[in-house]
């Protein structure tokens, strides 16, 4: 099952919070940087770096779990090794490796009898250059839609705006007001109002106030 909502990954109470990492031992930007500074202990970060130094060539497509130490609850951080060398230019995310690392995470979670997983919206699609529609429709949906796991995708306000912009780029029949190609789990032929309602129900916002007008784009929910 896949759920989507507004939220901060680092505040999730899911049993596992997962993010993409590279195989070079660097968490220098994006969600990885936040996790490094706000969640991981210095010892855990050194363990990640050591893992990369010793197993760099074998890490791509794997997953490493670390127990979160800053809360009283039992929660793990999943490092998804889906990026080899971070260049920040073009596509650094390896889609096949991302699928493999998520599959590896599911195996590790099942061993621990854990079923609740959270990821950030646009996983692998920030500086790593991935395409979110590819990640969502070709990787996440096949893996999680019919699985025993509950995957919660948490979007920050900027990511919600980005998703809305991408929806606006989908070809739409001007007469029927239906999208002409599948997008984000919606089949071709879906009326735009159905997708608008999905945005409002999923993210608890008003499309008109928060997304449709340029002068309100920075006003999105607080």
Predicted feature residues:
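Macrodomain-like recognition of ADP-ribose-binding/processing modules
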Residues: 1-118, 122-222
């Amino acid at each position: 099952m896949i759920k989507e909502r507004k939220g901060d990954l680092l505040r999730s109470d899911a049993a596992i919070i997962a993010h993409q990492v590279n195989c070079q031992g660097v968490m220098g930007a994006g969600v990885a940087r936040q996790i490094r500074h706000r969640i991981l202990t210095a010892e855990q970060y050194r363990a990640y770096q050591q893992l990369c130094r010793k197993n760099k060539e074998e890490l791509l497509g794997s997953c490493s779990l670390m127990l979160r130490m800053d809360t009283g609850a039992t929660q793990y951080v999943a490092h998804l090794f889906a990026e080899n060398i971070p260049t920040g230019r073009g596509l650094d995310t390896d889609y096949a490796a991302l699928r493999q690392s998520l599959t590896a995470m599911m195996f590790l979670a099942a061993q621990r009898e854990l079923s609740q997983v959270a990821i950030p919206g646009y996983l692998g699609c920030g500086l790593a250059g991935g395409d979110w529609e590819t990640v969502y429709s070709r990787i996440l949906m096949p893996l999680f839609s019919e699985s025993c796991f509950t995957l919660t995708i948490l979007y920050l306000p900027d990511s919600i705006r980005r998703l809305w912009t991408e929806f606006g780029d989908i070809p739409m029949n001007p007469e029927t007001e239906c999208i002409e190609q599948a997008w984000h789990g919606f089949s071709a032929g879906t009326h735009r109002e159905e997708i608008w309602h999905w945005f409002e129900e999923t993210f608890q916002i008003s499309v008109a106030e928060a997304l449709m007008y340029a002068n309100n784009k920075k006003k999105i929910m607080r």
